[in-house]
Structures are given as structure tokens and as C-alpha cells.
Amino acid sequence: MKISSGTINFSTIPNQVKKLITSIREHTKNGLASKITSVKNTHTSLNEKFKTGKDSPIEFTLPQKIKDFFQPKDKNTLNKTLITVKNIKDTNNTGKKNISEEDASKMTAAFMRKHIANQSRDYNYRVTGAAPLPGGVSVSANNRPTVSEGRTPPVSPSLSLQATSSPSSPADWAKKLTDAVLRQQAGEPLTTADRDFSNADFRNIKFSKILPPNFMKRDGDIIKGFNFSNSKFTYSDISHLHFDECRFTYSTLNDVVCSNTKFSNSDMNEVSLLYSITTQQQPSFINTTLKNTLIPHKANLSDVILNEPDNSSPPSVSGGGNFIRLGDIWLQMPLLWTENAVDGFLNHEHNNGKSILMTINNLPDKYRQEKVRAMEDLVKSFRSGRLTEARIRPVESSLVSVLAHPPYTQSALISEWIRPVQERFFAHQCQTYNDVPLPAPDTYYQQRILPVLLDSFDRNSAAMTTHSGLFNQVILHCMTGVDCTDGIRQKAAALYEQYLAHPAVSPHIHNGLFGNYDGSPDWTTRAADNFLLLSSQDSDTAMMLSTDTLLTMLNPTPDTAWDNFYLLRAGENVSTAQISPVELFRHDFPVFLAAFNQQAVQRRFGELIDIILSTEEHGELNQQFIAATNQKHSTVKLIDDASVSRLNTIFDPLLPEGKLSPAHYQHILSAYHLTDATPQKQAETLFCLSTAFARYSSSAIFGTEHDSPPALRGYAEALMQKAWELSPAIFPSSEQFTDWSDRFHGLHGAFTCTSVVADSMQRHARKYFPSVLSSILPLAWA
């Protein structure tokens, strides 16, 4: 019998192997149907074992020369070697037939095949072509699960053993893995040896180039059941692969690209994953153990298996390192809490939601104790690092978003440290967001920040009234946030009841207007006027408005109504007709001022005023026209003879024969960037300008119920006439156009109230070209 891989032949195998098999044959020839279950390094006497009977296991001492023949680097590996020989029986049930020479040779081959195939590093042979052993003999090595040699591959006429050397390069290892994975993909059962890639070298291998594309697809093919222990993966790319039931113990995984890599039901103990996990497209660890593994601080560990840690010391890494325990994992920490370290390790609000805080917190609740222990170690690190308030300030929000929540608040150590941090965070929020809108609350803000603010207002109830702008926003978002829990809403409602009972607030809610009209809020509808903001200047002044109105005024659109609220003084409703919204917001309710101004600058009506009434020639009149756009009603009237004469002098040159002069028309097109626009677009803009001048001429602004400035009526009608010439299609009908024209001039007995004309034209524009109207009409008139 020859080993088919070159110069090695059977005669080179030490005689001890032959003698061992001969001994087995001799001790079974007398009818013993024995189960020889193992041959291992033991001091048990062979003869003593045989005296126990035919059904008992028999243990043999493995000769030292056989161990020396293999010369593994780890002698303990061979000492643990097992040879299992099952159910060796005679073929005729007489119990007297000896094992044949051929069967003995097969047993010898099995012995050599299993042991040669499983040698470490320098002795990694692959044996192929062996015929099945007699009676289902199976051999196992290195304490690995026994794989039956009884499955029947194609039997060659003569027994041959093929020993192949270990792959000598990463490319060779990659080729071997590709072969095994493709066989597995094809449905071929792989032996333990087939899946054994321990001590492999995959450095610099990009796995997407050696495996079919389906392995990189979501829910694609899986690399299952492989042993990669002690293997090198440095600088390799295993992105988008799924490893299931694989073993990576003691492997080198530093500087590995593993974007979206999935490790499930795997053993990744004693591994370093430093510099391998980035904030984007992280790997996942599902039901995977990471005992004593070094993990970067931004890893996603939400599905790992944690166990109690052993007593091993913190690891040492090149370049230095600091670690804390998270269960039995080693979690990376900075050596020093520098400014960069504070931002990188703690500021998940600026780092795509990743920080050491979130890494710990995202573990499931069954690991509450492990999470609290890790956070306590983190806080101890803060204290020993002597973090100053100035250094903590940029990450206060991130810190309270985690540490001010259960279960960490149940730790006296953590609570004592986070309390002053939360107080400083709350003070900053009051200072910043009482006069400006809070950021649009996403899921994180609703679940992590709003509860902290509620808790802070609960601890400092005076801030509810001194900073009612912020307080009302917090309650608003708690009651409307889709990701807020019922518990958050209940606490918000309870706090608002305390607010309404405050002496500065309660006088404003018993006027038959608030909430459900009896002084209590009605949280069942967003239309109820449940919110009451106190003036920042006058304790007797308040604004009452609904949920929907408050939301839209904090985050306005071009169509937002800026007068859909009650203005209360001493609890009584007062008219806002002659109050400028911008002045009201600037003086009393600054939380709306920035949003109002942002919308106001997008309204371009003032550009036409500057064309007609230049500040150099008509400075006072220009100011009157601009000021009138900031309120719904004006006390200034321009119907006296002097005012009428002055307006006629200004507008007559612009309206020869009652129509826009060509030069003035071109000035309008240029001012509104309409020179190259379509006739319809030009017509829509002129129509909206006409509605604004109709408003100027009405009793609301410069006219009265019985009179109005003729120049303004004529100019409004001329703008409308030009719009009709350009695009009659934008009008409701020719009849409606004629009706509006007659009303401007009082022709054919038409009612001449320009307030009615302005309102009618404005409704039409809002319905058919609202964006044009919103870009022109002053906010106070909208």
C-alpha cells in the first residue's frame, strides 16, 4: 500500500503503527466483539482492560515514537488525540475469524489519514481516495467531533492515500476556501477536516473577488460551520458576508474591512476587532460570543451573547490602550480624556448615533447589570480623568440622553455624577430655546431628550413660567410626537396641570375659550386651544392657541396664518387688528420671531414699493407704505386732498390712459425676474400685485368705508388689466374679470368696496397659484 502523494510510502511509517494494528487484530481474533473506543496517552494497562469483558471499552497507550513521528509544534495536541474504532466484528458471527491483512491496512490508513490531516501548521495533509473502513471504523483527532469514515465515496480499485501540503500563501488559502464553500453551496456534506481552516492566512484577500456574488447579497449564501481559529485576516475585506456557526477564536481581525458583515451563532472569543469597525455599515453579531475580545467603542453589540468575565487582566495592545469590561468583552476606552476623545467616544449626536454610551446602552435589558457595571466604570474614568465642565459641555446632551435614564439612575454612583451635568444641560436649554423653536424632534429626541427635559421641569417648577416658551414646546412635542410613549405623555399632561394652576397662568384659562371651555385642556383634539404662552415682558399678557396652530407657527410654511390665536390681557381677549405681528413677536413672544422673519423675507411685495416710491424722493411715504404691510389694519389714511394730490402726482406718469406704461411694465418684470418668464407666469405675478394694491386702497389700510385713494384703485385695476392681456386663462371667467374691473371704478352700479375685491381676488390666487401669492402678499395680510 502506497501513499499517493509523491515519495512518501507505507514503509516509512514507523513499525509501531503496524504493531498497534496487529495487537488490535490479535486481541479480537478469539471472538471478542469489542468496542475499542480510544487509543490515547494513558498509563492504563492493556491486559487489565481486556479482563473487563467483551463489551467494555479498551484503552491503548499511544507509543512515544508515533508521537515523535508527527513532531507537532504543540505536543499537547497529540496527547489529546483519540482513535475510535467502533463495532469491530467478525464477518461470519462465529467469533473466530481474524481481521484480514487488508482490513488491518485500512485501519492503518484511517489512523494515518485522520492524524496527518489534522496536524498543525507544518503537517496539514489532505487524504483522499480511501475506501471505507471495515465495520464503520471512525477516527477523530485533536478532540474534534468524530466524523464517520463510513460514508461511501467512489471506491477506487486499490486503496490510495493522498497527502497534500498546507497552502503556502493567502492566495492558496483563498482557493482552498473557495473550493470548500462552493462544494457546500452545491449541497455536498463537508467533513470537519473540509471545514477546518485553522491557522489559515487570508491577509489582503478581498473575499468578494474569490466568492460568487450571491454570497455578498442580503439573504444570500452563507459560509456555515467553518473553523477559522488562529487565522490571519489582517487587511482583508469580508464585507457583506454571512458567517454562521463559525469559529474565529484567536484569529487576527485587526484592520479588516467588515462592512455589513454578519456573524451569527459564532465563536469570536479572544479576538481583536480594533480598527475593523467603522461607524457606517457596521458588522452585526447575532447570538455570537466575544469573550475577551477587544471591541471598538462604536460597535453594535445589541445581539451578542454576554457571559460573566474571567479573571484575566486588561489586554495590552501596540501603541497602548485602555479597556473596560462589558460582560466578558473588553470595550475600548481612550488613554486620556482629551477634547478629541470626549467628542469621539461620547458625542453620538455628532457621530451618526455612535458612541461608547450607545454601545453599552443598546444591549438588551437582560444585561441590565452588565450595562450598569460598565457605565459605572465609565463614570469612574471620568472622575479619574478630571473632566472639566468646559470639556463636558459639548457632550452634555449625549450624556444625559443615556445616563439620566433607568437603569443607570438606579446607581448611586452614576446619579451623583450625572445630576449636575443634567442641571447645566437644562439651564442651557432654557437659555437657548425659550426664544427660538426647538429642533424638529426625531425619534432620538422624543425618547431620549424630552423625558430629561420633563424631569428637569419637574425638579424646577419655577422654570415653567419663567421659560414658558420652552416649556410649551416641550409639552407640545411630548403630546404630538409619534415616538413618545404613553408614559411620556402622561407625565407631560400632569406637568401641564401644575403649570395651569400657577397664579401667573390660571387667570387666562377661565374665559370660556381655553381647552374644553371649562379651564381644562382637551388633549383629544389638536384643534382645542390647549396651549397658553406667557409674555416675556408683561405678566398680564398671554397667547392662547391650539396644537395645530402652535406647530405651524413654530415650523411655518408659506400658507401659515399668523393671526390664528387669542391675545389675552388680564384673561380677556383683545383685538390684534392694529397690532403688528412682528412687533408682537419681538416684544412678547420671541419664540415665533425668527420663523416669522424667515417667511417675511421671502415676500417680495416691497420691491414694487421701492420702484414707485424711492426712498430718496418719497422717504416718508415709502415708510408709511412699508409699515402698513406689517399689520392688518392701519390708522393712517390717505384720503385727504393733499394726500390724494400727492399720490396722483406719483402714479399718473405710470398710468398713461389708465394703463401701465411700457417702461414701468419692464421695471416690474425686471424687479421680479420675469423678463424671460412665460406670459402666464407674468400674469399671475401682476394679478397678485393687484390684490395687494386693492388692499392698500381699502378701508383696512389707507381708505375708509366711504372713500379710498383713487390713484391706488386705478393702479390696482391697471395691474389686473395687464394680467388679463397676458393670460385670460388665469381668471375665473371674463364675467368675473369685468365685475372686478367695474368695482374698481364704480361703473355700471357696481359695489365699490375694494376690501371685497381684494378678498375675492386673494381667495382665487390662493386656490390656483398659491406659491406666487405667498411670494408677494405681506404676511400680515395673508
Swiss-Prot record:
Residue ranges, compositional bias (Low complexity): 157-171
InterPro entries, per the entry: SopA-like_cat, SopA-like_catalytic_sf, SopA-like_central
Catalytic center residues: 753
Positions of the UniProt region annotated as Disordered: 133-171
Keywords: Secreted, Transferase, Ubl conjugation, Ubl conjugation pathway, Virulence
PTM notes: Ubiquitinated in the presence of host E1 ubiquitin-activating enzyme, E2 ubiquitin-conjugating enzyme and ubiquitin.
Intracellular or extracellular location(s): Secreted; Host cell
EC numbers for this chain: 2.3.2.26
Uppermost EC category: transferase
GO cellular component entries: extracellular region; host cell
Listed GO MF terms: ubiquitin-protein transferase activity
An individual GO BP term: protein ubiquitination
Catalysed reaction equations from the record: S-ubiquitinyl-[E2 ubiquitin-conjugating enzyme]-L-cysteine + [acceptor protein]-L-lysine = [E2 ubiquitin-conjugating enzyme]-L-cysteine + N(6)-ubiquitinyl-[acceptor protein]-L-lysine
One protein family per Pfam: SopA_C
SUPFAM superfamilies in the cross-refs: Pentapeptide repeat-like (SSF141571)
Family stated for the protein in its record: Belongs to the SopA E3 ligase family.
Function text: Effector proteins function to alter host cell physiology and promote bacterial survival in host tissues. This protein is an E3 ubiquitin ligase that interferes with host's ubiquitination pathway.
Protein name: E3 ubiquitin-protein ligase SopA
